[in-house]
Amino acid sequence: QGVHPQRVEAFGFTPWKQRSLKRFLAGSALRFRLPRGLPGPQAEAVAVWGRRARPRLLATARQRGLSLLQVEDGFLRSVGLGADLVDPISWVVDQRGMYYDATAASDLEQRLATGTWPEAQLARAEALRQQLVEQAITKYNLPGAGWQRPAGNRRVVLVVGQVESDASIRYGAPGVSTNLALLEAVRAAEPEAFLVYKPHPDVVAGLCRSGE
């Protein structure tokens, strides 16, 4: 929410991400810089992918009072995988922190915790939630076989895997760093449950190995 700065210098974005950033920051004058560069004198803000800003860049931005725009995939990203270079339909742009980073607050977190919501907006959000569930909309919207709950009354627990080098593990789950450790922790917490393990779609597609 809000107006993006007029002059934004973006660091370390690959060419295909540059194309998307131009769309999402339409109205801002964008200049793309190498990862090890520093903002020029006309910059009003710097943009980086996730938590990849180098310490020197962060220090320079703070010293000059420049806004830091941290960019990441949105929760409803695309029809297809980002690792397969499918263009996104949503990105998150946050000036405070990343939603997956448990070590720092984010604009999204603050907005949800302290914001006030008109009844009409709450009703719209609920209608959208119902529509997403009914139409089985997911982050990547990949085709797949249907799943049926196992027979009986046994508790079923979904265990969602991740690419183990992903920043969400580094900053969001300091006590669990591998998918195997995650499964072991869930089994210890749910000894009688039926566990369903869902590997990350990038791993299933062969675009990343689990530990990459």
Stretch-by-stretch model annotation:
Residues 1-212:
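Catalytic-core helical/loop segments in enzymes performing group transfer/polymerization on anionic/lipid-linked
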